Amino acid sequence: MTSTMSAILTLRQLFLATTIGGLLSFAFQSNLLAEVTIDPALPTYKVVPGLSGQIKSVGSDSMNSLMLLWTEKFKEKYKGVRTEVEGQGSSKAMPALIEGAASFGPMSRDAKPNEIADFEKKFGYKPVLLPTSIDLLAVYVHRDNPLESISMPEVDAIFSSTRKLGGEPIERWGQLGLKGDYENEAVAIFGRNAASGTYGYFKEKALGNGDFRDQVNEQPGSTAVIQSVGENRFAMGYSGIGYKTSAVKALKLAPKAGEPAIEPTDA
């Protein structure tokens, strides 16, 4: 199941990058995941009296909800600690750690070799990379759109100018088989900006590392993509499944035309 899903772009691992000191100050987060099996050798977390100061997170917008949850839980134990979460994009995570502007750098992709090298040059050791969760990336349309599924070559043909998956350009809904009001309407496409790990993951998995079309309306965050698609019945965009609302519909995805499509789910 996992290998099939990976082949159609859906699953990606999320990471939390930090310095060694940052890891120690946030270690109790494992106890928040009661439903997940925890290493029995992990010592029980003990509250440290008198802890104060600030914890700042800079990085993936896709992980904002998780970071806000974790920092709020941390503040329940430490009333004197201030927390701040900035979802600027995964590419901002490592520079913020290196510059001392953040304690944690959430990333919705693997750290790049040059990012790890820059960190090691600064501190003399590699960053601590903690796999935290699995995210599912989905392709969305307006909730009233009759389209139910789409193939990966079609996704590439809509979002990419280079179309490395071999399809012809798709610019109108009629090319996807829709009739009536949709047939001659252009597909308004929405996505993330280059600072986002979601942008890079979609580029790799959905576009075969091809180039995005200039017509993609780049949004600053996952929520903004969903809002844009939900407000335009001729729109299509990509975002994490955790940001899905009643205003949009996540399309079933097929590796190729004519092959079974897999329905994205947050279960």
Can you annotate each of these PLM segments?
Residues 5, 19-20, 51, 256:
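Intrinsically disordered, low-complexity segments enriched in small/polar residues
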Residues 9-13, 26, 49, 85:
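Residues at the start of alpha-helices and the adjacent loop-to-helix junctions
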Residues 1-4, 26, 33:
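N-terminal amphipathic/basic-hydrophobic helices that include classical n-h-c signal peptides
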Residues 2-19:
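Bacterial N-terminal signal peptides that target proteins for export
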Residues 14-27, 31:
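Bacterial N-terminal signal peptides
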